[in-house]
Each structure stands twice: as C-alpha cells, then as structure tokens.
Amino acid sequence: MEYFLQIRKTKTVSAFPVGIVAGQYVSTPVLNKNGKFIKFFDGWNGGRKYIIDMAGFAVGVNHYVKMADKFNEVKRNFTIMKFRRGYEENSFLINMRVPPKKFEFLCDNCQKVKLCDLFYIKTYFHVFFT
C-alpha cells in the first residue's frame, strides 16, 4: 500500500526498482549517495535512452495531459510511437520530455524493491516448480 501512496504523489515522472525482470533480480535507476541519477540497471540495454521496465515508472496525470496537449499542437517535435517490442517504455518516456536526472525517485531513493514483475515471476515459478 505504501508503494501506491508514493506513486500517487508523482508530478512528472517517477521511477522505482522492480524485482525479477528479464533474468535479473532487479531493474532500477542507480543513484549516488546524494540521490542523483547515475544510470539505469536492467538486464537489457538495447540502445535505449530510458533503460527501464514498464512497471518501473509512473507519470503524473497532469503532466501526461500537458504533454498530450503539446503533442496535438506540434506533432512534428514528438517521436511517433510505433510498436517495437522492448522499446515501448523508451518511446513513451521520450515523449514525456523529462530527462532521467529530473525523475522523482521513489522507494527510499530506489533502495527498496516494493514491486515484482508478475510476468517474470510466473516464468520463474514455472521453471523451478514443474
């Protein structure tokens, strides 16, 4: 419950660790001791700017609406979100126009994992218990 209360306060884009993603124990932003963004840690880079799992970020409703309005005004300045497996998060976050260093980092500055990706949990349980 605490996790969702934190997400509710997201103004622009928030990020947080997600457990058991893509063969790794965690997918998370990596921060320094002062809470400043250093890089993303994820099992798959793929040349993405935003190396983050879909379950590892939230967008504030007001920010989303503001960016959607801008998208409708000036479509030429936005990345068209064509489907490409593994790049959905990247395209979406590029259009939100918030660089990773400006993200709101939740879960005690990304030190605690409060969410696991259920797709991968199902995969792991199938492998280990069948």
Which positions does each model-derived feature cover?
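Catalytic donor-sugar/metal-binding loop of nucleotide-sugar-dependent glycosyltransferases
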Residues: 90-114, 121-124
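Intrinsic disorder/low-complexity detector
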Residues: 34-36, 92, 119
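Conserved catalytic core of nucleotide-sugar-dependent glycosyltransferases
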Residues: 1-86, 102, 125-129
